[in-house]
Amino acid sequence: MAKRHLTRRQSWRIEKIQEERAARAARRESRAVDELEGGDLGPEQTGQVIAHFGVQVEVESADGQVSRCHLRANLPALVTGDQVVWRAGNQGIGVIVAQLPRRSELCRPDMRGLLKPVAANVDRIVIVFAPRPEPHANLIDRYLIAAEHAGIQPLLLLNKADLVDESNAEGIDALLNVYRTLGYPLIEVSAFNGLAMDELRGALDGHVSVFVGQSGVGKSSLVNALLPGVDTRVGDLSTVTGKGTHTTTTARLFHFPGGGDLIDSPGIREFGLGHVSRDDVEAGFIEFRDLLGHCRFRDCKHDREPGCALLQALEDGRIMPQRMASYRHILASMPETDY
């Protein structure tokens, strides 16, 4: 079935209805919070948001107890991974009273182009891809730019390594060699047959990680393999499009035995970069960094200008053609106002 294209007025009307529904839900939650705070609440304590359900969240206390909590109306938007101050209620539902400062946050633009945090206090972003759906360097590079921009260490993860065969091995190897040459950590695993899963566990232990990647690459299957007994919905590739069907519906935080945490978030087909500038994109290509600022012209676009340090590095083989093509493709997809 063809995707329905909405007019601007239809999109505005849908957005307005959603905002009105959200406002009504927020008013109901505000009344619930007032009722709770008018009764008996426990002392303030710190906890971590491990799941978000719109107007309510699940919070885990220091002793491992999980409670559903209302949100005070004056709080900023909370996401999975946030550290908070909360008070337990005598009816089993508590109240979040404050958000603690974030060490890091991973953001992406929403449909209106406004930045929306999707995870907090993450120190490792695991970029998952697979032989099927076919991996594209441009999408991987977008995730790498987002990780570099957020100051979060990336880890490249090829899942479904058991699907590498004669038909795709050459292309997969060439893709992996690009990122190995750049020095990015990269692990090849299979959640299906257990290949290198112990190596992955070692890389995740002691970190707060988030898995990102297009749908169908097996993020939820990886969670099931890493944490047996965890109930996550797993989908397969669409038989019509060959793209992944979205399965996980809300970001959740899980604990690894070694002390690390995993935030499993909904799959997305393409990661937007509307929140970064041209300078941010350039800085996200790590092989560009020592060259930036050394072009003959200060406003060099690294296209055909004489004396361009990046073009000289491309000619000398210090920048790979695939990476330069990806850089140009990403810039071409950005609004001209960001240039």
From Swiss-Prot:
Binding site for Zn(2+): 295, 300, 302, 308
EC id: 3.6.1.-
Keyword Cytoplasm in annotation: yes
Major localization listed first in the record, in broad terms: cytoplasm
GO molecular function, one term: rRNA binding
InterPro entries cross-referenced by the UniProt entry: G_CP_dom (IPR030378), NA-bd_OB-fold (IPR012340), P-loop_NTPase (IPR027417), Ribosome_biogen_GTPase_RsgA (IPR004881), RsgA_GTPase_dom (IPR010914)
Textual note on the cofactor: Binds 1 zinc ion per subunit.
Protein localization: Cytoplasm
BP-aspect Gene Ontology terms: ribosomal small subunit biogenesis
Binding annotation for GTP: 159-162, 213-221
GO cellular component, one term: cytoplasm
Subunit: Monomer. Associates with 30S ribosomal subunit, binds 16S rRNA.
Similarity comment text for this entry: Belongs to the TRAFAC class YlqF/YawG GTPase family. RsgA subfamily.
NCBIfam families: PRK12288.1, ribosome small subunit-dependent GTPase A
Protein name, per record: Small ribosomal subunit biogenesis GTPase RsgA
